[in-house]
Amino acid sequence: MPTLYVVATPIGNLGDMSPRAIATLQNVALIAAEDTRVTQKLLSAFDIHTPLTSCHEHNQRQKARQIVERMLAENIDVAVATDAGTPCISDPGCVLVAEAVAAGIEAVAVPGPTAMASALSVSGMEISEFTFFGFLPRQKNELKEKLLDMARRSKLAVVHESPHRVKDLLAAVAEVLPHTQVSASCDLTKKYEKTLRGVVGEVLRQTEENPKAEKGEYCLVFAWDERDIPAPAEAACPLSLEAQLFDGLMRGLTLRDAMAELLARGERKNAVYAASLRVKEKLA
């Protein structure tokens, strides 16, 4: 019976590539890669000549079936690798693993680097339990709601963030959960590696003052403070967009001005427009 190997690769420093990972990638018949161009550079660095096929976010369902069918038909072993770190952890790969397991193929881990574990290990925080949330919503109000939900569900949270959005994330945390302790690791194992630690407002300030703050991807660890977390009964129930538009009308605003007010708060344009249509229907 064939085997699917889930192979962790370096998150930046090639010295972290394990001998077992090298041997596995050399010995399988095919490597399913998130981006074949990125993985090809890694293979070239270790003189590995195994054929590659793409298996990424946009094609993984169709490709997973094709790969599994070929594994069974030709009785070949396959490895899955992403651009960096461990597949399936906020990265492609889980669809292929699920498809293989459903077909009776054994999935075997070849462990190695992962940004999440690396960031936790240098956080300086006590880690008895944590929750990994991957990437968070971009829209401001959705992000704030998600942060409060995370704080209620976990003592310690780990997230990924891009260098261009990390300041917005820290600012949102500082606004709704200001006593949060943060460990923000940037560009782990690479040239501009740096970890900032402290209360979220201080980490935000240091990030804003750091000219190299946008040089690499971030993995952040948040330790919430109970003082910031509203009890479920105390948590405010936000008004619907429709109700907020009616509130604006009651304050003497035109519907257009009430819509503009919501858009200025960061609400989504299509959602505000849909709410305005419902308001017009009720006023007709």
Model-inferred region functions:
Residues M1-H58:
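Glycine-rich, flexible N-terminal cofactor/catalytic loop recognition
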Residues L25-I31, G104-V108, L156-A157:
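Short active-site oxyanion
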Residues V95-R153:
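Class I SAM-dependent methyltransferase SAM-binding "motif I" and its flanking Rossmann-like core
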Residues C55-R61, L136-P137:
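Conserved helicase motor
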Residues L156, P163-A284:
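A contiguous loop/helix-start segment that scaffolds small-molecule binding in enzyme catalytic cores
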Residues A64-T114, S118:
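Glycine/small-residue-rich loop that forms an oxyanion/phosphate-binding "nest" at active or ligand-binding sites
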Residues A109-G112, V159, A184:
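General beta-strand structural signal in soluble alpha/beta enzymes
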Residues T3-L4, N75-A79, K155-L156:
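Loop/turn-to-beta-strand initiation segments
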